Amino acid sequence: MDVRDAVEADAGRLAELTGAPTDVMRNLVHDRTVRVAFERRGSEGDHEAGGESEGDDSDDEHILGFVSFDAKRETVHITQMEGTDAATRRLLEEPRRFAANEGMSVELLVASGNEAHRSVAETVGFDEEGPGPRFGGTPTVRYRLDP
């Protein structure tokens, strides 16, 4: 599995992962830092896990997941995360690394019923901080990782 910056051409696959319109995901790529985890088709195992890529051969790639984030004040806010458990675990390293380099905390809101994302957050070291805001009536749980 490799990780690279998302590009506009990824919007269709990101829309498939989220159920959101392609235009919304295209705007996400423009407005936030978005990283995608992918595997090259037909070459599984040819690349070391966690590698970096320039992403110049997107037709030969299968996107497994993505994470979007932005930084405000002293906190990196993870705004969206979708994908396989392995991909989301790997992708959470991206905002964590950025935050560590900048001496910032990381915050993640997860829908309270999304056990897969809650488990991934806890597995990679986030601490549950209590309830977060509601989005569209859905309660969330706030997770935080301090430097």
What label would you give each PLM region?
Residues 2-14:
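A short beta-loop-alpha structural element at the N-terminal edge
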Residues 16-58:
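Active-site rim helix/loop that mediates acceptor-substrate recognition in acyltransferases
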Residues 45, 55-71, 77:
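Conserved beta-strand in the GNAT
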Residues 73, 78-87:
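A short, internal acetyl-CoA/4′-phosphopantetheine-binding micro-motif in the GNAT/acyltransferase core
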Residues 83-100, 119, 123:
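Conserved acetyl-CoA-binding loop-helix of GNAT-fold acetyltransferases
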Residues 99-112:
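Conserved GNAT acetyl-CoA-binding A-motif
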Residues 109, 127-142:
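Conserved catalytic-core motifs of GNAT/GCN5-like acyltransferases
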Residues 112-131:
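Conserved active-site alpha-helix within GNAT-family acetyltransferase domains
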